[in-house]
């Protein structure tokens, strides 16, 4: 359904014929407002008709009065004033009469339609489709006024029907194309060439209908949709104070006026038709009124005379929607089933349902909001709605079954239904709620004047087959004309000794099987006719049953989606559950999935969904979702997860969660801790990369001998974010990156050596002495903040732990560990010449450099591919998370593609890309770096990306797949040496990054890219974006000075700088140097301690 900007309704009114349904339907409107189907500021009113047979015209006048009264009160008036209509867009929806196939009427008849774009998952009723059509298709562009829409028809309207409102006044009807044959049983408009309505025919003659045929050979059908301008609505409203039209409103009823039945089309609108004379109008009567006594005719004549006075001068025009469709929802079961099983683009066979054996459903059947357990066979052209059935069950062709649950399944075992309508109803009899079951045939007529049939046979055949007699069904004084399905007391509602079930009507299909027992039980029951049953239907209980069943299947869906690792977004379901009070069962389901998961990825996603539920419960209040997650109250659940005890961990999380549900701020903080728990499971999954970390023993360097590693930076050309856990092992990742020197230098490095003191000396800072941070660790306690990324020297401390030099949980103190294994301690210094948050992969490459230097200083050689996996492990120990692309691109030389498969253990495989001769130099001539002067840590963006990935937002899932696909195309462009094509991929890569992490493009950066665009084949921010370095492929070679001049002329770009960049053919380099007793220019006595 279309979800573009639509009408911002001032008031929406839903009229209904039963006063005990008003609150029920008011709640349904409010639910739709919470689902964002209705604007938040719209006034919602469910209004009962003054009388059950007030007619569509009377219901419209009454609704208009109620709307004006509420708007007048809101505006501060003490009397009803029509002035409030001048700035109001009002929508009146008419529920209409009872419908034999749905206890809540045609408006709430569920359709086999899903709306994947809806922010909240929900069944789609006819009301929802009509609301969408009125709000987003027919309504936009209309001036203030009153739209009236029946709900007794199915409509289809193109996204932009092209309705012009220029110079409009009066009233306007919307018409849809229909065949001449269809029009014989419906209403049609006769118009002139200007679109003015000349006449309205209902079930007209062939000659009348022929006059209405348009150039397309079709006729304009009366659709039930009307618009009244403010002027016309004021004239209509003015009639409510004068007899006899005052009787159409609740005010008239409260004043004791005699009820009058009025038709919207054949009373109110017909008097505006140009060909209608006053005499003919006053003498006529609407088709729904039928033939009555003279008093009624006289009363109606007075009402029509008043309408003529008020409305005759108002023009009535028609808009014809040639590409639209209209279908009245008749009481013909065959036609009803055809509408619900007709294949079409938007129609799914299984809608909001969980079916264990879908292969048993035949092609043209429809299942809506059902749970089908075991073998349930459904034949062609059959429909199941709102049922929870347990097989074995066989339902053949041409059936409609609704409102049954598992308790009623047994009644269907051993039967095969064909061409029947079986429904379960919630009725309230003398204040008690009970279930009643009705049975009818597909060919039966629900009209009073219809053919005398029941269960697809004549009454005489039915009496003969079942033993039932006519006096069982009708009183002796009931005239033959009134003896029909509607009045027959067929349906048991109370048995003196037992509860009733579907078997109390199903026996009529095979009476001989029951040897008279069923007939005796049937006769012993209190029975009602269909007409008698309708006022007893409890619509609140009906809708509650449907809602409970919907969420029952939705919880099963959630469980299946998670356990089967499906890429379906659960956020709409979460919003639905929270919005309609089902958050508790959903949380319990997610707990079960997480606790029972064999795969840490499934458990982590389930915990992420719990965080989403808690965030949704906070309703946008309580602060940002991202934030700290180390409150002491959550330590115990986290410790269980860290130890691998998933079941106890999930249980402890749920127990703690109960204490945090009372207000939005606590809910948000609880959500953050669930994301913290999810991160523990991600860490455990990524830790599997340790399988691919191995070292070889080599000669131990002499004490004091430096091991120095140097590394280039990296530039990512395609596929970034796909390397990020859990995407890297759930979808699989592929990233193309370049190892690069910046301004001719390899900006990242580390050096390590053994020292005689059994201590760890750490230094972080530039390669030279100034601004160096120095730390000495003399005990294990000095290392315990290794997992706090912002703690001084945390990365270096984590490197010692991951390299296996220090064992934090050993009983031996640090001094003894170092002396026992190495006869002394270590000194480690790391440096980067790049600014913090550069986007060039600094921290991961630095971790690789530090690990390589440390391992070699400890007498171990580690290969580059092992080092790539070791950095993954280190970053999980450090708790920064992150993917593998930085170390792949910075530790390995040149141009390469790294790949990981959708599996655990997490393994990264690297392919070096061979390019044409001379193309590397061409890249060097055309590739430039621009420092934007802005920094943003990738972690700030990472939490949002992970949250959206675990939610499986369609845009994120699709984009992640595109990232991986484009990496392979980009690699091919490098192999071909196609610079312009690489520029195109670079530009689309930047668009993909922005889709993945909205907010990664600061305004100043956007301005800078706009300035540079004419000079570049393509450009992107490095890494996750948000700031740092921008890189671009220039159209001309060696453009550093040119771009500096261009940027200098632009205003407001801040502290930028342009840098040369070249592909590094070496990658990580390691060398052993001579002795040096100095630690970055400071002796041990000058070094601080932690």
UniProtKB/Swiss-Prot annotation:
It catalyses: L-fucose + ATP = beta-L-fucose 1-phosphate + ADP + H(+). GO terms for cellular component: cytosol. Isoform 1: Expressed strongly in brain, ovary and testis, moderately in kidney and liver, and weakly in lung, spleen and heart. Isoform 2: Expressed very strongly in brain, strongly in ovary, testis and kidney, moderately in lung and liver, and weakly in heart and spleen. The keyword Glycoprotein does not apply. ATP binds at residues 834-845. One of its GO terms (biological process) is carbohydrate phosphorylation. GO terms for molecular function: ATP binding; fucokinase activity. Keywords: ATP-binding, Kinase, Nucleotide-binding, Transferase. Pfam families: Fucose_pyrophosphorylase, GHMP_kinases_C, GHMP_kinases_N. The keyword Transferase applies. Takes part in the salvage pathway for reutilization of fucose from the degradation of oligosaccharides. This is L-fucose kinase.
